[in-house]
Amino acid sequence: MSLALVYSRALSGMNAPLVEVEAHLANGLPHFNIVGLPDTEVKESRDRVRAAIIQSGFDFPAKKITVNLAPADLPKESGRFDLPIALGILAASGQINPEKLAQYEFAGELALSGLLRPVRGALAMAWQGMQAGRSFVLPQENAEQAAVMRGIAVYGARSLGEVAAHLNGIEPLTQTECKLPRRPSEQSKIPDLADVKGQHTARLALEIAAAGGHSLLMMGPPGTGKSMLSQRLPGILPPLTEDELVEVWALRSLLPNHQQQLDSNRPFRSPHHSASSAAMVGGGSDPRPGEISLAHHGVLFLDELPEFDRKVLEVLREPLENGEIHISRAARQAVYPAKFQLVAAMNPCPCGYLGHPSKPCRCTSESIARYRSKISGPLLDRIDLTIEVPSLSAAELMQQEAGESSAAVLERVTAARKIQYGRQGKVNAELSVSELDGKARIQKEAQEALGAMLEKLSLSARSFHRIMRVARTLADLAGEEEVNKTHVMKAIGFRRAL
């Protein structure tokens, strides 16, 4: 047989389109050519494949070898096609059984010794390949990642020789099994909310944000506990569901670091304020996920919010509304999920001490206005909760009584989320405008109070709907079916800090 077909997958954002690797051997001067819009890394695989085949004890055919990666208009990158190319050549030259090739999809980079090295996007490939009905053969390091997908068989191999022995029926590979962790990793120590003294309003806002999935902005002088509170938010969020786990791990598998710990911790990303737009939303010639996508189903914490470049902050507007980000480059486009919970912290002025009870502010009114203008109105309009975090007095700091623990708050948050999922199948922050009208259940008195405050404060329609979502969360935390006037007034109070 001089022609062989092997299945593999490329990466395009979270998608993994099917690639058919065709290997053809013909008489003529020995030559090895790869066609089908391969990247530089793929072209370099010729030398890796030749050395790996020889080092694995096989004969490299002294013929004219043509490898086609179809479809030709799909860009191909990285060394993931090394293994399928090598198997195609071995099958076309009659050194392995070609009949079993159609049952599997292959991916893996080859070392010169024939050993297999891990590749990016193993879980994303398995996620996309479930409907094809084929099994996967991957490097051992990638197999545990891909095996979390239910309903698909994944086999891990350490070398080209092991894969060939499996296909020839000499020594079958063992199917890889991976059990989904049901609890957050004990190795990751999430700080406890009991460490925070005082700040009852901020603690309540944090609980509301956790219960309804709302975004939160905290403003206050340096050292008042804004960052401390934010770092404790993951500790009062319920563990990831199984579907959420798969999405989070699929995104992690796209990173260059292939060895990712598989746990059910919600992501917590805290990029530095010098981060670029590409670092925040993703990008590059081969688009990779950015911080907002790596925070998918978790928390994105932006400390010193006005210090971020305004262009970087403005790119948050689309994902805050839609829960995904579209990246367009000259030759490639990618869509990544970005359903994150935004938590931000900032000082009230450049020096940080505006309104401080003992330290005077050194800023002019112009510098304060310029400082706050770095955060645009449309972005602020998309933040559900905005609170002030005041400095504590000496007596409050010296008190020995610990605050309420994260475990106690988590119980209330879990109960509120259970109500929301039972009523609408999602958290309140994700309710659309049409869903909000049917699910909010606002009392007539509360509607009248809300309408009066909207006119008085000149709030936008977006603010109106976000206030309704927060009020619905307050009612869920209280275990009440209807939103009353108290819930509405509290929700309005959480939007008046700026």
Regions found by a protein language model. Give the residues of each.
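Peripheral, non-AAA+ core regions of ATP-driven protein-machinery
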Residues: 1-217, 221-224, 328, 463-464, ...
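Basic, amphipathic alpha-helical bundle interface domains used for macromolecular binding and assembly
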Residues: 38-46, 61, 68-78, 286-287, ...
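Short loop/turn elements that form and flank the Walker-type P-loop nucleotide-binding site
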Residues: 60-63, 100-101, 131, 150, ...
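Residues immediately C-terminal
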Residues: 112, 300-301, 307-308, 394
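Conserved alpha-helical scaffold flanking the Walker A/P-loop in AAA+ ATPase domains
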Residues: 207, 261-262, 267, 278-300
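Walker A/P-loop
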Residues: 218-257
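Clamp-loader machinery-focused feature within the broader ASCE/P-loop NTPase space
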Residues: 243, 247-280
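Walker B catalytic acidic pair
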Residues: 297, 303-304, 315
